[in-house]
Amino acid sequence: MKPEIIIMLTHHDVTVKDAGEIFEQCKDLAVKFWGFKNVGLPKDEMKKVAGAMKAAGKTTFLEVVTYDEASCLDGAQTAIDCGFDYLMGTVYYDSVAKLLKENGMAYLPFVGKVSGSPSILEGTNEEIIQNAKDLMAKGIKGFDILAYRHVVDGEKLAREFCAAIDAEICIAGSINSYARIDTMFDI
């Protein structure tokens, strides 16, 4: 599978205030995947920006960094209300997966033990890979792995995870340099 980049209109885990303007200036780039977080913009503005992305033929992603079930459900409902194609993030809950499936939305939950703000990823590579396999058995078809937030070796984790898991994989977590972007294409 050819790697793709998702342009996230965020800074320090918050959607930038001028996300709509930035997208309008960049919408003709040959980048298919665009998104932002559920924090930083009011919901009506999120809906407007997501709509502009879709009108330009882009696939849209909302990333939600929450850990309790109620907050994860709220983030899922926001993604649905705003018309996103994918919800990325949230700790996996059956209720979130069910809501998204009922509304025809793709779901890339976090994998491994994610906590804190900014988020960190804990667990051995083997535990994280097994967590993904367990979620795939429940019907999950892709993951948001915060490799560069891993407490040990994010690059090694990303390589091992991609080799072991046959699913859509979004490697995330501070991919904020050309060197890290190049590494993603190498993996």
Please describe what each predicted stretch is.
Residues 1-4, 56, 102-105, 165-167, ...:
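Short coil/turn connectors at secondary-structure junctions
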Residues 1-61, 66-70, 76-82, 136-137:
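Conserved N-terminal beta1-alpha1 strand-loop-helix module at the mouth
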Residues 3-10, 32-36, 60-64, 87-89, ...:
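Hydrophobic faces of well-ordered beta-strands that scaffold small-molecule active sites
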Residues 19, 46, 72, 128, ...:
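Aromatic/hydrophobic pocket-lining residues that form the small-molecule binding cavity
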Residues 23, 50, 76, 97, ...:
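Generic hydrophobic/aromatic pocket-lining and core-packing "Φ" positions
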Residues 57, 65, 69-150, 164:
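Conserved anion-binding
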Residues 147-159, 163, 182-186:
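Contiguous, function-dense segments enriched for cysteine-driven chemistry
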Residues 166-187:
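C-terminal alpha-helical cap/extension of soluble enzyme domains
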